[in-house]
């Protein structure tokens, strides 16, 4: 994969330096629905410390405490899983095992594929843990603001749309969404939110 654009993207988010101005770095939370590892790879290539819920290195085990570590530039929440996650017999939580590691015939990838059962699958761990963290992210404290930047999302996952809409309704204007949208006019879910006086 060519990660040139992803690397430029994360550098722009994490290093928005301007001559003569200092930058007070704040952690960026990535709520990722794609299965690839382009964001994680870009963060690593950019030397940005991040947590994705897995402890270890190339081979890793699930440990959500990694999200609470000090000094993180980013947290990456893979809400639908990842191409490098594997589930083993008698284990509830995923491990990161690259395809280059042999002798693991029993491992299998665990991702939430597009299907009518997608919502039900998100209620199991580790997805339910990731969803709970995402809910907290989307609900800033009363004395703060949050911006959710959405790129490459088609708004076709109803369980994701419900979470975004609930957060917009519950935060009384403290959550702003910025959507990179390919159409000239708003359609579907975005149009409904834009026309809703409580949300807008």
Descriptions of predicted regions:
Residues 66-72, 128, 132-200:
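SIR2/sirtuin-family catalytic core signature
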Residues 37, 83-85, 120, 155-157, ...:
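Short, catalytically relevant binding-site loops at active-site mouths
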Residues 9, 30, 76-79, 134, ...:
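Generic structural hydrophobic/aromatic packing signal, biased to beta-strands
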Residues 1-2, 13-113:
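Extended, H/D-rich, highly charged conserved domains that either
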Residues 25-32, 120, 146, 150-155:
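Short, charged/polar micro-motifs that form catalytic or ligand-binding hotspots
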